[in-house]
UniProtKB/Swiss-Prot annotation:
Membrane-spanning residues: none
SIN1-type PH domain residues: 382-487
Region of interest called Disordered, as start-end residue ranges on this chain: 38-59
Binding annotation for a 1,2-diacyl-sn-glycero-3-phospho-(1D-myo-inositol-3,4,5-trisphosphate): 393, 428, 464
Source species, domain of life: Eukaryota
Record's protein name: Target of rapamycin complex 2 subunit MAPKAP1
SIN1-type RBD: annotated span: 279-353
Keyword tRNA-binding: no
Family annotation (CDD domains): PH_Avo1 (cd13331)
BP term (GO), one: negative regulation of Ras protein signal transduction
Subcellular location: Cell membrane; Endoplasmic reticulum membrane; Early endosome membrane; Late endosome membrane
Region feature Interaction with ATF2, mapped onto this chain: 468-522
Length: 522
């Protein structure tokens, strides 16, 4: 047993003892108040009065003044009691009793009295269920749509319906295209079928979407189930297929092309434009002639006249002087435009301006056309590229790609030009419209491996010349192809160039004649 007379040590011991035994915390609060009262009753002593004794006692008790227990701190929740494990267990038992009150216990007892079969039958009496007559109600919209579209479920092109952009207008990038169908009858082919496709679709996907919409609308005749049997061509606003250009590449995205009018054309295995027999009508005009392709002999002469005038004026608006058609063998007799080609019994006509007549000898060209020449002239309008060298003024050359079609001539520099562009000016791309082309002549041919040709065109009211070199076979093919294009197009620039060239030749001839005459007189 220990005897302590220091109240501070005793208070600290009591606090430490109540850490684990006092759950209320009230003793701790009482003891703190007692410390405050103790300080008031024992003020600090005056220095000098038994200073050594006070200093000794204060040195021993300095660490215990207001010493509280280690685990108890003074805060706003100082007097809040933490729940013990016993209280938590009692709370859990209380909740279990409440849940038991909500449950109802029913005791199962065996049935002692036996009931007869009639009593059991009366308990579960069979009900008579009468069959309801079929209701003649209104059909749902879904049933009506399924009856109206019996081919929708059997559409072989359903996989391409996901590229239909009609439900995505305004939310996703789409593209609206008018598609002409040359495989239709003569009446239906005049009206295009509007297709809205996703901008991310490829050309092959667009062909499948066109076939899907064509089949869904129940059009005739039926299409081939293979999408690869069709291709897309550029078409005019009136539905005429532009065969001068190849079909669109099926692997390219459709947003790459800016055409709003296309035509769905069936592919053919044989070379050429189609496997069917091609029919051509020759239209003679001033400074050249044109070959108009027709599908059959049932076409009217009015359609042939419109195509001939459009071919003559090119991209210009069809306005100004009016024209008429005459048979080549019957001058000054206009052809009935409402009649068909079959009733004319002729394949060669002449395009004459109204209120005028054919001059003598203007159209005295040979009417006999070799079929090989016709095929060469038709193929000349198809796009083809050649790799040649362009000759500049200082006689240095630049490798270029020369692309020739029925509408324009494109000159694109080859990208790999490190040697030529290091010291010289880089060649820029050039595009020349065929209406501005004037002539294409062979300049020189030194050997089978080297030849030079000259291309003349109109630029800003002045004639410019471009010189190219390549092997003799390539140069000969290019010159022949360009001349076929020039002969089939009635170009004003070419006519003016030939007239100017003829005037220079006449002036030179007259000058040499006068010079010879003067020398003879002397």
């Amino acid at each position: 047993m220990a005897f302590l007379d220091n109240p501070t040590i005793i208070l600290a011991h009591i606090r430490q003892s109540h850490v684990t035994s006092d759950d209320t915390g009230m003793c701790e609060m009482v003891l703190i108040d007692h410390d405050v009262d103790l300080e008031k009753t024992h003020p600090p002593s005056v220095p000098g009065d038994s200073g050594s004794e006070v200093q000794g006692s204060s040195g021993e008790t300095q660490g215990y003044i207001y010493a509280q227990s280690v685990d108890i701190t003074s805060s706003w929740d100082f007097g809040i009691r933490r729940r013990s494990n016993t209280a938590q267990r009692l709370e859990r038992l209380r909740k279990e009793r409440q849940n038991q009150i909500k449950c109802k216990n029913i005791q199962w007892k065996e049935r002692n009295s036996k009931q007869s079969a009639q009593e059991l039958k009366s308990l579960f009496e069979k009900k008579s269920l009468k069959e309801k007559p079929p209701s003649s109600g209104k059909q749902s919209i879904l049933s009506v749509r399924l009856e109206q579209c019996p081919l929708q479920l059997n559409n072989p092109f359903n996989e391409y319906s996901k590229f239909d952009g009609k439900g995505h207008v305004g939310t996703t990038a789409t593209k609206k295209i008018d598609v002409y169908l040359p495989l239709h009858s003569s009446q239906d082919r005049l009206l295009p079928m509007t297709v809205v496709t996703m901008a991310s679709a490829r050309v092959q996907d667009l062909i499948g979407l066109i076939c899907w919409q064509y089949t869904s609308e129940g059009r005739e005749p039926k299409l081939n189930d293979n999408v690869s049997a069709y291709c897309l061509h550029i078409a005019e606003d009136d539905g005429e297929v532009d065969t001068d250009f190849p079909p669109l590449d099926s692997n390219e995205p459709i947003h790459k092309f800016g055409f709003s009018t296309l035509a769905l054309v069936e592919k053919y295995s044989s070379p050429g434009l189609t496997s069917k027999e091609s029919l051509f009508v020759r239209i003679n005009a001033a400074h050249g002639f044109s070959l108009i392709q027709v599908d059959n002999t049932k076409v009217t002469m009015k359609e042939i006249l419109l195509k001939a005038v459009k071919r003559r004026k090119g991209s210009q608006k069809i306005s100004g002087p009016q024209y008429r058609l005459e048979k080549q063998s019957e001058p000054n007799i206009a052809v009935d435009l409402e009649s068909t080609l079959e009733s004319q019994n002729a394949w060669e006509f002449c395009l004459v301006r109204e209120n005028s007549s054919r001059a003598d000898g203007v159209f005295e060209e040979d009417s006999q056309i070799d079929i090989a020449t016709v095929q060469d002239m038709l193929s000349s309008h198809h796009y083809k590229s050649f790799k040649v060298s362009m000759i500049h003024r200082l006689r240095f050359t630049t490798d270029v790609q020369l692309g020739i079609s029925g509408d324009k001539v494109e000159i694109d520099p080859v990208t790999n030009q490190k040697a030529s562009t290091k010291f010289w000016i880089k060649q820029k791309p050039i595009s020349i419209d065929c209406d501005l082309l004037c002539a294409c002549d062979l300049a020189e041919e030194k050997s089978p491996s080297h030849a030079v040709f000259k291309l003349t065109y109109l630029s800003s009211h002045d004639y410019k010349h471009l010189y190219f070199e390549s092997d003799a076979a390539t140069v000969s093919e290019i010159v022949l192809k360009v001349n076929y294009i020039l002969e089939s197009r009635a170009s004003t620039a070419r006519a003016d160039y030939l007239a100017q060239k003829q005037r220079k030749l006449n002036r030179r001839t007259s000058f040499s004649f006068q010079k010879e005459k003067k020398s003879g007189q002397q």
